[in-house]
Amino acid sequence: MADVFADGAGVAGGCCVGLSWAHRVGGVTTDDTVTTDDPRDARSVRLTAGDAELTVLPDNGCRIGSLRVGGTELLRQGAAFGSFPMVPWCGRVELGVFRDGAERHQLPVNAPPHAIHGTGRDTAWRTAHAEAASASFTYDLAEPWPYPGRVTQVFELAPDALTLSMGVETIDDSFPAQAGWHPWFLRNLGRGGEDVRIDFSADWQEERGEDHLPTGRRIAPLPGPWDDCFGMSDGVDVTLTWPGELELKVTSRSEWVVIYDHQPEAVCVEPQSGPPNGLNTLPRLVTPIDPLEISTTWRWRTLD
């Protein structure tokens, strides 16, 4: 589940991923050719397409620092800002513990009493490739995650859309993993318009217990406010509308999305490869021949 405090502290299939993803979008450049100044990160990569501008901060967990369309910022700025990758798990892991067969693993408890949102957001990523409207980044899985592997994240910007892709691969033993994104979309775009509206049709809602973890029961979707995981059998499809200003659709082939709207300045629509605590309840194994892959597209159009 999303957590307003955690940020400030935070689809299976396809062929091999890792650096091969970078090769799909072009050759590798050096970091120096793609850096610009940013107050939160000495090394930022900026992509442009039409009037859309994206800033990626590889040293700050490879999060999106800014997404501007026609000069208007769409993502919250400040302590909990932008959009960060959730990897190698999404949401909360109960008491920070997961099991892989007979092996028991303890993760850092960074949202007591649970572990939340993975380690990728706390890690500096390497720039594998960057050009005007696309870039790819990697980092190697290491302690406190107990298995070696590699994560690749690809950004592809168009004048009316942003496509994000992420892959997790093992370089040794198989292991369970999840991946997804945690964007902080501005509730109000600050141009005198109305607050955002969130529209979606879910097949089920993961019932949330008092410990903020799914109980294991799937229930009929409830009205908001939400800090909840929803299931969409045909893939994630959520529309954010700032009336008279902008419409943005978040889509993904993945079935799960967490929606969070408790924060006064932002809302979260988080496509992810499995439900919270899924390392325990719905483990998806990453194997040498079957990496984990997930992607999401954010497509927008102006309404004014």
What are these regions (language model features)?
Residues 1-17:
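Extreme N-terminal basic, low-complexity initiation segments
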Residues 17-105, 236-252, 290-304:
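Beta-strand-rich N-terminal accessory domains
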Residues 21, 28-34, 108-159:
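Extended, loop-rich substrate-binding clefts of extracytoplasmic carbohydrate-active enzymes
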Residues 54, 58, 139-183, 188-190:
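Acidic, contiguous internal or C-terminal segments within carbohydrate-active enzymes
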Residues 99-103, 128-133, 156-161, 189, ...:
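A short, structured loop/turn motif at beta-sheet edges
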Residues 154-165, 283-295:
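Acidic/histidine-enriched ion/cofactor-binding microenvironments in catalytic or ligand-binding pockets
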